Amino acid sequence: MENAKMNSLIAQYPLVKDLVALKETTWFNPGTTSLAEGLPYVGLTEQDVQDAHARLSRFAPYLAKAFPETAATGGIIESELVAIPAMQKRLEKEYQQPISGQLLLKKDSHLPISGSIKARGGIYEVLAHAEKLALEAGLLTLDDDYSKLLSPEFKQFFSQYSIAVGSTGNLGLSIGIMSARIGFKVTVHMSADARAWKKAKLRSHGVTVVEYEQDYGVAVEEGRKAAQSDPNCFFIDDENSRTLFLGYSVAGQRLKAQFAQQGSIVDADNPLFVYLPCGVGGGPGGVAFGLKLAFGDHVHCFFAEPTHSPCMLLGVHTGLHDQISVQDIGIDNLTAADGLAVGRASGFVGRAMERLLDGFYTLSDQTMYDMLGWLAQEEGIRLEPSALAGMAGPQRVCASVSYQQMHGFSAEQLRNTTHLVWATGGGMVPEEEMNQYLAKGR
């Protein structure tokens, strides 16, 4: 971006200066509305989410047999919700900032099949596509036992079709593993940030991995192009897919059920704050949408991004969405948080969700490494760096009197708050790699 343009952008949005300087930044969204007001802009409804629930239930018998690790939950792919009181104390000590209420961790990092939040959206979109093809071919009805999809006849049928996706790693893992299991030919276009072990794991499942020297945006574009020339190839579009988004959104009702089971209350007197790591935006956007449908105005969602890849904060704050990239303002998009190394946000998610998100913040790679180490020490839970992005949220919210006043939170409401950090990945990181991460923490 030329200097004059840059100067006028900074004059209009002074916060951009802090982003350019790679400062850890917090922006509380002044444009937040009620759910009733913000919902129409999403373009999806409660019914769409219910349909996604129903589809996953139809596939449950299949998943329970195809992936024995899901058998115990009857083929439902869901993660644990755990309290992390020792980590809460450690954060308070390190940041000299009390965190009111209770701190919980949502362990999507340990979801079965692919060990990340992408096991929600990625697997769902592959299943939705498989169902559509099988229904259209007259091989399946909605009332069938879907475990029949494991038969050689179906494998043969699906092998005529292929799936392509562009990914920094975790989405590729979930889509690659699921597609290969169903019988699709699958190609994952991986950006330069993708970890070697993720590529190796995909290849071990018979997935074709195409590697790029460039970032996520290029991998997605190339994947899209490659798919266009083949009518039997379905491209899963991480930047714009409503189906992926709905796969993530199912998490809202599921979390509500987990809260009920644990006897936790979310209402006007007991607000819920959720901190979601954000790459291109589909995962956190879909989850936040589901949470809003489940808990209404009593849930407050925040997106967390690396200082080197603040694409969603930049897009929503300036209102330019996918018309601006972090590279345009001189940021390199290089971060250890490979799952979040995205330079240009999803225009669909930014525009759909900007009224339903309370804020956005950035944190440095070093902060992620530090918190990765603290969590391992205090709670014995090991995550990959990007999964710690949410962990910086509670102290930012608790430290901001202006945010608390903007929403009219009383001292009592803050005392009764639940802070939920969404851990997005790390359950399948090889030991050797994990030890390298742990060595970088302070």
From Swiss-Prot:
It catalyses: D-serine = pyruvate + NH4(+). Disulfide bonds: none annotated. Pfam families: PALP. This is D-serine dehydratase. The modification N6-(pyridoxal phosphate)lysine is found at residue 118. Its cofactor is pyridoxal 5'-phosphate. GO terms for biological process: D-serine catabolic process; isoleucine biosynthetic process. InterPro entries: D_Ser_am_lyase, Ser/Thr_Dehydratase, Ser/Thr_deHydtase_PyrdxlP-BS, TrpB-like_PALP, TrpB-like_PALP_sf. Keywords: Lyase, Pyridoxal phosphate. The keyword Lyase applies. The lineage of its organism: Bacteria, Pseudomonadati, Pseudomonadota, Gammaproteobacteria, Enterobacterales. The keyword Lyase applies. PANTHER family: D-SERINE DEHYDRATASE, THREONINE DEHYDRATASE, MITOCHONDRIAL-RELATED. Signal peptide: none annotated. GO terms for molecular function: D-serine ammonia-lyase activity; hydro-lyase activity; pyridoxal phosphate binding. Monomer.
